[in-house]
Structures are given as C-alpha cells and as structure tokens.
C-alpha cells in the first residue's frame, strides 16, 4: 500500500500493526514492484563492456524478513543498524559479479566494488557499508537473469510504502478493514494496493 507523499503511511502502519489478520509488515521507501533501477557497466576479462541492471531496495529493519529474503552471510538486520549508519545487503548475483572470489565484503564500503556508486554518494553523508549477502530475489521473467541488487536498511522516515503479509484465513475481511482504516486516516487519497503474488 503506497502513499507517495509519505505523510500518512507511518500513522496508518501504527494503526494496523495490532490487527490479528496481519502476519508481518514493514515500512519501506521502495518495494519489490516499485524499486529503483540503474545501469551498471562492468568489463569482462577481455576488456569488453557488459551492461547489467542493478536493482535497489530500501526498507526498515523488518524488510528482509517480510519479503522472506534470507541472509546468507553477515550481520542480522538489528546488528547492522546498530553498527552502521547506512547498512546495505548485496545479493548473491552482486557478489558474484563484483566481489573478487574468496574475498569477504562484509564491513567494507559499497563504493570499493562499485565505482559508480561512489560517485553518487553525497559528501558529508554516512558511507554505505556492506552488512551481508542475501539470497537472490527474482523479480523479472524466467528468461531474465536475476538482477544484482542492493538492499538498504533505514530507520528514518519518510516512508512511502507499507508492505503487509496477511494471514491466509479471512483475507477478504482483512483487506476491507485495511481499506476502512486507510479511508479514516487518509480520506482524500483512494485506497490502492498491489498483491505481489498476483503481479508475479
């Protein structure tokens, strides 16, 4: 459920958190459907340029759990947020393409492996540090290679999305209750949601 103004999503999430029909939820600045993409140019061993699409996700400390993305190596989300101002998880594909074989990237700056990323970091802002490696998340078609991706953990609003995992039973009633709550908090914006399972 999105509110691109970021004005009401926090209030909405606090209101619905107590609903028994909600299994898990997280706040995020981008989702698995609405996420940022950029082109990443790498060179093969012969010096030929290869273009890749890099996916970038951003959510709170429960984002990986709600999306059922497992951490394969590195810190837990809680530990990462304690240790780093801007913790980032790289996926298996990112590690395969950018991290030298046998090297442990955890605790190192993202810009060490991705020079374009370093150019985009703003002066005076905390450096993005790799907190761990997560499993690949397939968001394209079965014919597309999985995107290398970065997942940022954040604890600072504004958030634009609340992503909810509903319990299977009473789903229709749960959606009706979410709509009713949304209309009470945010009456001027229509209630709209995307079902990830339907989209994919």
Name each region found by the language model.
Residues 6-26, 92-93, 115-200:
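"Rare, low-scoring activations can occur
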């Amino acid at each position: 459920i999105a509110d691109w103004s970021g004005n009401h999503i926090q209030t909405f999430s606090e209101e619905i958190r107590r609903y028994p029909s909600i299994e898990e939820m997280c706040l995020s600045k981008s989702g698995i459907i609405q996420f940022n993409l950029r082109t990443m140019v790498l060179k093969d061993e012969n010096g030929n340029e290869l273009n890749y699409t890099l996916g970038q996700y951003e959510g709170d400390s429960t984002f990986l759990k709600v999306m059922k993305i497992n951490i394969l190596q590195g810190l837990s989300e809680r530990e990462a947020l304690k240790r780093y101002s801007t913790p980032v998880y790289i996926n298996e594909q990112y590690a395969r393409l950018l991290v030298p074989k046998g090297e442990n990237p955890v605790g190192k700056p993202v810009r060490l492996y991705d020079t374009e990323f370093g150019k985009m970091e703003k002066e005076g802002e905390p450096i993005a540090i790799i907190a761990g490696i997560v499993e690949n998340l397939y968001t394209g078609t079965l014919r597309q290679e999985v995107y290398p991706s970065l997942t940022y953990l954040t604890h600072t609003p504004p958030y634009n999305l609340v992503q909810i995992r509903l319990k299977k039973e009473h789903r229709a009633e749960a959606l009706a209750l979410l709509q009713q709550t949304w209309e009470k908090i945010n009456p001027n914006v229509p209630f709209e949601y995307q079902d990830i399972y339907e989209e994919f």
